[in-house]
């Protein structure tokens, strides 16, 4: 298989594909709407993902321009997130504002690329910013109704960026190259570096949705159209997690232990506990499915923090695994929510009898929710097992126990929806459009397959984790 | 030795087949149960002939980064439970989904549960154990939630919350075992000698977590409240599987931890006391029930408490008694739920205050129910007698004269059951008229279960000779 | 011949009659199949008794548990086994024959005969059991068949209730018996009677666990042998068909308890538990005799009389007079079966009327009357009926104990009184349906019902010869006292019921009191409601546990509810929370560094 790299030098292939995608989408803005363009765009996303996976397979690594670097970590996460972005794009192919969506999605792809392949902190901020701005415009493109969530997202994104830049400014004297591989040690200015760490944490906590920085999330998720919610929960948040891993695990890795413990671990320990409980407890009483999933995705972020808090290879492996796992689960779930929303079905009560109205959707949503609740043999269980194990491994039994308690609490609200869906109601059947069905099917099948044989994803996650820590 | 993974692959294949050929759901699930039974009989027969006492394990690579393998093991305990499970599954699939249209779904869930039950009983490490444990919980959840009767929603909710709480504890315990065992092993059988190298407080924590998890599943007082609702609201097939097989998950786990964990000895006396209380408590509670399925559900608590008591004796004969008790109880409770389901189907009524003189129009079912009571009260030449003998010999060996106390809860059980049957079944003055006939298929279910009860009751050495060599 | 072959014909006959009973055409032959089975078993039994050398018995390995603990089926053929076998062998075919006449509705015959055959098979198994496992199998078989047969007439009001009472008592007894068996096993590691007796006999002091075990076995035996306070089920058991009463509830099944106590008597003596037998035997026989005097139910009088007889057997055992007990064991079975068959014939002729004041006399059928009198004098203990010797032996055994002797003599009087009350009251009574119809019915009584009675009456008399031949010395004084007491009883009955026009006894307060059965049933009811009260209490505890879980869940939901306000849609809140979070993080920083 040396043919492919020979044909197309891989490190150029990805930027090329993204550039083509952006140019192509810009051009299609000028022409009439054609279904084929959507197909081409989806294909481009798919090719990007595939190239990334091939790079992973070929163990390709390298550094470019002191801004980007390629390694197993970046390749795995870019490939997976690009794949997720492709799924989200697939959701929107029939939307009326598809032209704008295409362009904005290709910008999102660019953002994912920048963050995943970041070598410099600058690449991370550029990537994050691109993703947020693109998302804001995506929401806005749906009409006047959506100005409010777009503005909220924009404001919070701006604050996040501000905090990020402030952290960067504090860091500059100690890390003039802004490279994430520079190890920051506890020499002079350790308090300044610590402050910078905290500001980074706050900035990324806003975007990853850690409590108490996450109050905007349910509001914006609920206010936005379902497909963009899927994007925000499935891609934006995960991109922020990639940034978290890069900054805290790579850059601050040797910022070492202090009197009462590792600062990174402590910060994420606290954030993890708060976030899990916050998301789950409020999700318990939600009547609106979309909001419920919004809160649920908050609590799921808390699980990812467990692995980061453990800051061991196993923990990072688990976090990477769970980032991808949750992306699949939440995109699948929000796709169904998105579709039902367009049929004016929003509340849990209205989900009653979904099994008879569209068995496929009911079964898929059930599987996805069971996976989120951590029921084996689904992907969520494999991820949680590794995360909780990593917590125990680094002697944080408390964190593991809280994680397990939270997965138990989450059963309550997932079961509520399942309970409703399988009730008998005399309602007409509703048809699911083929593109949404495809997204749901892909997510569900992957959730089951990787769940039954987690090694498919665990192997690459392990490789990726080896680069990070 | 045939690959044990066949026991999982075959039902999985049938699961897929039912999903495709929806019209043949019941036939396919029956064939699946038959195939499973044939395989298990083959393994059973070959172990009986070879008389090998060793646990047979087969491993496949699963999660190398954690050092977790997909290990399947067959011990003597699991063989007996597998045999029981396949007989019940066969009877369950064969007797069909009386009066309900959703037969495909029902068959699918039975086969899914078959995967869970087989997988659990042949799991060689706790990771696999946990996976199949939860599969075994999800299938009955839908059996209650979708196919159940009037109060199914609350019942299924309670069921899933309790069961998954139990599995949360189980998960915690498993993770602890993983990190404290030398060499990070989760292998159920090879852990036997390794627990003692862990710190005492960790052993105690692990044991308590396992114990409470299994205790919820079995169930024991005071964590039993989910059971009467769940078992009585499930569809007939669901009740048969729940009471017959699912409660044995906990029993199986209890046997494993008591046999392998030396720390159990410091708890066994308290656990035996708890089990005794639980048996009497449930017996008294049963007397307040008027719903025939709830009554049968309460007998499950009583019998499982006695089985727990037997395990807590920590004697070889006590373990055998518990195993035989599970075999006996699984078969008989499935029989009784099938009979109760038949009554519900025929008379559209479950309240024993309303039902009168059932034996007039449903002789078979009435006598089947009666035989069920006989077995539960320990009639010789049925499995009930053998298990009572073994259990209480174990009890006396371990606790002296107090070891006989739980036996007296059977007076309450039998006394009340006879009251029920004589009021509602065998008092024919003003018999209730049935609105439907009992399907012939249900009679086939009766026949299979009765036959097994008598075979294992009259020829107990079939099972005991296997177990005699080694309980594991 | 293996000893188990003795029950084979019965099992085959029972199965055949069940199968025939299901078949429309075969229904009529059901009874004959069962009778043939019983007769076959009986013949085999008699052959076995005649040529004991032919028999093979001993231990059959049944199963082994835990590697070494074996559960064998043991059989034995000692004298007590033979006695019980003879009784069953004689009575069982007679009962089947009687049933052919008595059970004349064909619809339910299959069920009846299979239950009866199973019962007879269990009885034979019990008789030949040589160890507790075999014994307990038979014991449970007796209990269950008895339960089924008592409740045989499901379409009536009372039988299901009576069956429930019987089975409840029987279950209590079964559990006590099983507990005792297991406790004995735990001490001695054997189930074999002979081994147990020799092992305990060799002990200097009997350990407490064996005493408890023996007590449990004795009380288990009391439940089946209807001893106070477990005796009330037997009077209710009269709701079953009469052949059942004649077979199970007077002559055979109720002897199971006596049988096991006789077997274990050496160790009961060794464990100093004879007083239990004596005390409960005396109480039971008093209760039984007086209840019999109070009742007006044709069969219940006999049932209470059976209770009294069983009590007397336990008295004899309590006095360690095994031979007296065994002698009474035999004669009682014969005359009680006879009397029940007699009562059944009366009922049959009177359309199942059971009140002795309503039935018309059986003096119209002279044969019936004659065998009835033989039964009655045998029960009363008048020479030349064999009952006389049974009572005489027990009385002689008690002669060393003045209190017991006096009580027994009073009971002799009461026995004579109530059985002749039973006999006299219906005499000359016209009955509701007019005499002509009744007379026709009496003369139409099936031969199958009369023949067994004649045979039994003959046996009751012939046994006398046997006793005269076998007994070497009898206490003349005791014989005189017994005869006097009984005759006095009969005389009182004659005076009260044959000569006096206004019936003093029947309207007296004491009879009314006695007919209430010493409030034992009321005590049962109190116990039952006590258990029900506990059940209510437990139920409320259960409710509390449930509520506790709900309250916990509610609490968690409430926390969630109160936190929901954070997502109020106002950006200011979000930014404020963010600021707080930042402060929190800085606090962590300060704390950690």
What are these regions (language model features)?
Chain B
Residues 362-364, 417-472:
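Cytoplasmic/organellar membrane-interface segments at the starts of transmembrane helices
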Residues 134:
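Short phosphate-coordinating micro-motif centered on Lys-Gly-acidic
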Residues 38-41, 114-118, 307, 455:
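Aromatic-anchored segments of alpha-helical transmembrane domains
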Residues 8, 12, 30-40, 86-87, ...:
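Alpha-helical transmembrane segments
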Residues 1-6, 13-108, 189, 468:
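Transmembrane helix-loop-helix hairpins at membrane boundaries of multipass inner-membrane proteins
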Residues 31-47, 163-174, 449-458:
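Hydrophobic alpha-helical membrane-insertion segments
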Residues 93-97, 115-127, 140-389, 393-423, ...:
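Hydrophobic transmembrane alpha-helices and their helix-loop junctions in integral membrane proteins
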Residues 23-35, 154-164, 362-366, 442-447:
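Alpha-helical transmembrane segments and their helix-start/interface "positive-inside/aromatic belt" motifs
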């Amino acid at each position: 298989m040396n043919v492919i790299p020979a044909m197309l030098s891989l490190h150029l292939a990805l930027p090329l594909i993204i550039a083509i995608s952006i140019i192509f989408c810009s051009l299609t803005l000028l022409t009439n709407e054609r279904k084929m363009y959507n197909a081409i765009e989806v294909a481009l996303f798919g090719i990007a993902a595939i190239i990334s996976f091939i790079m992973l397979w070929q163990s390709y690594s390298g550094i470019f321009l002191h801004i980007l670097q390629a390694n197993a970590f970046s390749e795995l996460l870019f490939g997976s997130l690009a794949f997720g972005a492709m799924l989200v794009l697939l959701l929107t192919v029939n939307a009326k504002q598809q032209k704008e969506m295409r362009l904005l999605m290709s910008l999102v792809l660019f953002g994912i690329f920048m963050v995943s392949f970041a070598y410099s902190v600058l690449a991370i901020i550029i990537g994050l910013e691109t993703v947020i701005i693109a998302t804001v415009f995506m929401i806005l493109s749906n009409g006047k109704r959506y100005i409010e969530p777009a503005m909220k997202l924009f404001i919070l994104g701006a604050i996040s960026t501000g905090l990020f830049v402030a952290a960067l400014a504090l860091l500059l004297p100690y890390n003039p190259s802004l490279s994430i591989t520079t190890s920051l040690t506890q020499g002079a200015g350790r308090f300044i570096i610590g402050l910078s760490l905290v500001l980074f944490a706050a900035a990324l906590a806003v975007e990853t949705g850690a409590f108490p920085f996450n109050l905007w999330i349910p509001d914006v998720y609920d206010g936005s159209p379902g497909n963009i919610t899927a994007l925000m929960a499935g891609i934006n948040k995960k991109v922020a997690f990639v940034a978290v891993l890069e900054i805290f695990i790579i850059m601050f890795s040797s910022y070492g232990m202090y009197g009462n413990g590792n600062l990174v671990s402590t910060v994420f320990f606290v954030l993890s506990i708060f976030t899990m409980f916050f998301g789950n407890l409020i999700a318990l009483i939600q009547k609106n499915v979309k909001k419920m999933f919004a809160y649920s995705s908050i609590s799921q972020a808390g699980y990812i923090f467990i692995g980061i808090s453990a800051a061991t290879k196993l923990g990072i492996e688990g976090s990477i695994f769970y980032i991808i796992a949750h992306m699949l689960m939440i995109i699948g779930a929000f796709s169904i929510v998105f579709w039902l929303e367009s049929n004016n079905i929003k509340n849990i009560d209205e989900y009653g009898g979904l099994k008879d109205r569209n068995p496929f959707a009911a079964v898929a949503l059930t599987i996805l929710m069971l996976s989120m609740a951590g029921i084996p043999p689904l992907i969520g269980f494999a991820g949680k097992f590794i995360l909780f194990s990593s917590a125990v491994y680094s002697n944080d039994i408390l964190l593991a126990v809280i994680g397990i308690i939270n997965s138990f609490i989450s059963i309550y609200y997932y079961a509520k929806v399942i309970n409703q869906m399988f009730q008998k109601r005399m309602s007409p059947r509703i048809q699911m459009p083929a593109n949404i069905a495809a997204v749901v099917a892909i997510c569900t099948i992957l959730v089951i397959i990787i769940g039954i044989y987690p090694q498919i994803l665990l192997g690459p996650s392990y490789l990726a984790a080896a680069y990070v820590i | 030795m045939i690959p044990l993974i066949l026991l999982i692959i075959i039902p999985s294949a049938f699961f897929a087949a039912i999903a495709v050929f929806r019209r043949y759901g019941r036939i396919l699930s029956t064939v699946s149960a038959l195939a499973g039974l044939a395989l298990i009989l083959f393994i059973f027969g070959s172990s009986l002939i070879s008389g090998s006492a060793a646990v047979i394990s087969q491993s496949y690579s699963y999660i190398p980064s954690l050092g977790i393998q997909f290990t399947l093991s067959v011990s003597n305990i699991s063989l007996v439970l597998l045999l029981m499970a396949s007989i019940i599954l066969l009877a369950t699939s064969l007797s069909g989904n009386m009066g309900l249209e959703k037969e495909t779904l029902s068959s699918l869930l039975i086969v899914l549960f078959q995967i869970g039950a087989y997988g659990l009983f042949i799991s060689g490490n706790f990771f696999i154990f946990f996976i199949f444990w939860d599969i075994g919980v999800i299938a009955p959840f839908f059996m209650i939630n979708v196919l159940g009767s009037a109060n199914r929603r609350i019942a299924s909710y309670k069921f899933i919350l309790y069961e998954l709480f139990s599995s949360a504890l189980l998960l915690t315990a498993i993770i602890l075992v993983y990190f404290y065992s030398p060499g990070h092993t989760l292998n159920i059988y090879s852990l036997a000698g390794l627990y003692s190298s862990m710190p005492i407080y960790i052993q105690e924590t692990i044991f308590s977590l396992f114990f409470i998890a299994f205790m919820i599943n079995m169930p024991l007082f005071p964590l039993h409240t989910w059971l009467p609702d769940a078992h009585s609201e499930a569809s007939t097939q669901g009740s048969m599987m729940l009471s017959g097989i699912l409660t044995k998950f906990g029993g199986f786990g209890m046997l494993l931890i008591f046999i392998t964990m030396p720390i159990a000895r410091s708890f066994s006396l308290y656990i035996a006391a708890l089990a005794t209380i639980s048996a009497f408590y449930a017996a008294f509670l049963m007397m307040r029930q008027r719903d025939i399925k709830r009554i049968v559900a309460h007998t499950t608590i009583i019998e499982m408490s006695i089985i727990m008591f037997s395990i807590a004796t920590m004697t070889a004969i006590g373990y055998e008694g518990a195993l035989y008790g599970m075999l006996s109880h699984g078969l008989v409770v499935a029989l009784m739920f099938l009979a109760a389901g038949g009554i519900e189907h025929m008379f559209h009524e479950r309240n024993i205050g309303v039902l009168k003189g059932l034996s007039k129009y449903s002789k078979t079912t009435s006598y089947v129910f009666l035989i069920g009571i006989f077995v539960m009260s320990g009639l010789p030449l049925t499995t009930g007698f053998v298990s009572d003998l073994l259990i209480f010999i174990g009890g006396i060996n371990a606790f002296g004269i107090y070891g006989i106390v739980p036996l007296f809860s059977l007076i309450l059980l039998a006394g009340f059951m006879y009251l029920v049957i004589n009021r509602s079944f065998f008092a024919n003055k003003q018999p209730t008229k049935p609105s439907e006939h009992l399907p012939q298929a249900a009679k086939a279910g009766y026949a299979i279960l009765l036959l097994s009860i008598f075979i294992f009751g009259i020829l107990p050495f079939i099972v005991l000779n296997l177990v005699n060599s080694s309980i594991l | 011949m293996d000893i188990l072959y003795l029950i084979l014909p019965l099992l085959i006959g029972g199965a055949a009659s069940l199968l025939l009973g299901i078949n429309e055409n075969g229904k009529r032959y059901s009874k004959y199949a069962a009778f043939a089975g019983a007769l076959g078993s009986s013949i085999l039994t008699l052959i076995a008794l005649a040529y004991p050398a032919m028999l093979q018995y001993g231990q059959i390995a049944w199963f082994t548990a835990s590697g070494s603990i074996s559960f064998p089926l043991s059989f034995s053929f000692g004298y007590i086994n033979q006695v019980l076998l003879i009784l069953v062998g004689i009575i069982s075919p007679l009962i089947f024959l009687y049933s052919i006449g008595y059970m004349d509705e064909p619809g339910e015959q299959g069920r009846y005969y299979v239950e009866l055959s199973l019962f007879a098979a269990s009885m034979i198994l019990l008789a030949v059991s040589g160890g507790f496992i075999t014994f307990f199998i038979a014991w449970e078989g007796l209990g269950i068949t008895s339960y089924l047969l008592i409740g045989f007439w499901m379409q009536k009001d009372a039988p299901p209730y009576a069956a429930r009472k019987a089975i409840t008592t029987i279950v209590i007894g079964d559990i006590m018996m099983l507990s005792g068996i297991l406790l004995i096993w735990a001490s001695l590691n054997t189930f074999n009677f002979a081994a147990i007796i020799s092992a305990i006999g060799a002990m200097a002091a009997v350990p407490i666990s064996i005493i408890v075990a023996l007590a449990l076995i004795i009380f288990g035996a009391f439940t089946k042998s209807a001893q106070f306070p477990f005796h009330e089920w037997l009077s209710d058991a009269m709701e079953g068909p009469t052949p059942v009463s004649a077979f199970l509830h007077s002559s055979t099944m109720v002897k199971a308890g006596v049988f096991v106590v006789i077997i274990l008597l050496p160790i009961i003596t060794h464990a100093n538990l004879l007083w239990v037998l004596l005390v409960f035997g005396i109480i039971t026989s008093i209760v039984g005799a007086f209840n019999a005097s109070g009742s007006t139910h044709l069969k219940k009088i006999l049932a209470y009389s059976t209770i009294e007889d069983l009590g007397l057997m336990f008295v004899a055992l309590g006095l360690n007079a095994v031979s007296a007990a065994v002698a009474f064991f035999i004669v009682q079975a014969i005359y009680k079966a006879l009397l029940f068959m007699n009562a059944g014939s009366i009922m049959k002729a009177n359309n199942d009327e059971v009140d002795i004041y309503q039935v018309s006399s059986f003096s119209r059928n002279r044969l019936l009357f004659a065998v009835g009198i033989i039964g009655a004098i045998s029960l009363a203990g008048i020479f030349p009926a064999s009952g006389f010797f049974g009572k005489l032996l027990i009385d002689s055994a008690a002669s060393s104990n003045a209190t017991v002797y006096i009580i027994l003599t009073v009971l002799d009087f009461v026995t004579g009184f109530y059985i002749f009350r039973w006999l006299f009251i219906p005499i000359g009574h016209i009955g509701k349906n007019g005499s002509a119809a009744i007379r026709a019915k009496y003369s139409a009584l099936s031969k199958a019902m009369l023949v067994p009675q004649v045979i039994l009456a003959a046996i009751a008399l012939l046994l006398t010869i046997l006793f005269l031949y076998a007994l070497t010395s009898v206490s003349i004084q005791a014989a005189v006292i017994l005869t006097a007491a009984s005759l006095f009883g009969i005389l009182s009955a004659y005076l009260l019921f044959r000569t006096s026009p206004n019936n003093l006894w029947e309207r007296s307060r004491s009879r009314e009191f006695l007919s209430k059965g010493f409030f034992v049933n009321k005590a049962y009811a109190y116990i039952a409601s006590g258990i029900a009260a506990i059940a209510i209490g437990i139920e409320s505890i259960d409710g509390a546990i449930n509520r506790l879980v709900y309250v916990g869940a509610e609490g968690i939901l409430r926390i969630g509810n109160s936190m929901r306000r954070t997502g109020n849609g106002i950006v200011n809140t979000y930014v404020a929370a963010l600021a707080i979070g930042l402060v929190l993080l800085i606090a962590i920083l300060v704390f950690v560094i």
